[in-house]
Amino acid sequence: MMLPFNLQQWIEENRDLLKPPINNKNLYKQAGDFIVMIVGGPNARKDYHYNESEELFYQLEGDMTVYAQIDGKKEEITIKEGEMFLLPANIPHNPVRPENTIGLVIERVRIGTDLSDGLFWFCDKCNHPLHHYRFPLTNIETDFLTRFKEFYASEDYRTCKNCGDVMEVDERYV
């Protein structure tokens, strides 16, 4: 069991860990039921995370935006400093954090469950689905990187079958 600690002090001492490209740190790696992460900005990811369980966002410093794919449309949800938001399960979402922002995110642990994760990309021009992965999540700090690299290495994956637009390569992942 981990003893109580001062979260603000932890953030001050560990800001250097909350940097691109993914910017998150799991605070309770041995927890059995929940992933409790501190996430920093800026981030510039274009993928949409898919989680078969709810996610709780609590914005500690600065404001952020969560883009969500709802009924085939890109919706924008703003979470201001001090606000919290419970994202329902099964909604592809892209949390966008500007520079100098910090948030707390709580998700269910998926190891030992039949829940899977996903990463989805949508066309910047017409919002048509480009490519997606579904996979069992074992380590929230590292499992996405392999899929990012594979997606950005493939022009076919990045090319919209609807309008022909090609998503730019994110150089951090090639």
Roles of regions detected by a PLM:
Residues 68-70, 97, 105:
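Residue-level recognition of conserved beta-strand positions in structured domain cores
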Residues 99-118:
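A short hydrophobic beta-strand segment most commonly corresponding to one strand
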Residues 63-65, 102, 129:
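Structural motif
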Residues 1-40, 45-47, 146-174:
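A short, N-terminal "cap"/entry segment at the start of jelly-roll beta-barrel domains
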Residues 130-137, 168-174:
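Short Cys/His-rich "knuckle" micro-motifs
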Residues 39, 78-99, 107-108:
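Conserved metal-binding segment of the jelly-roll/cupin
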Residues 121-126, 160-163:
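Short cysteine-rich clusters marking metal-coordination/redox-active sites
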Residues 50-81:
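A short beta-strand-loop-beta hairpin characteristic of the jelly-roll/cupin
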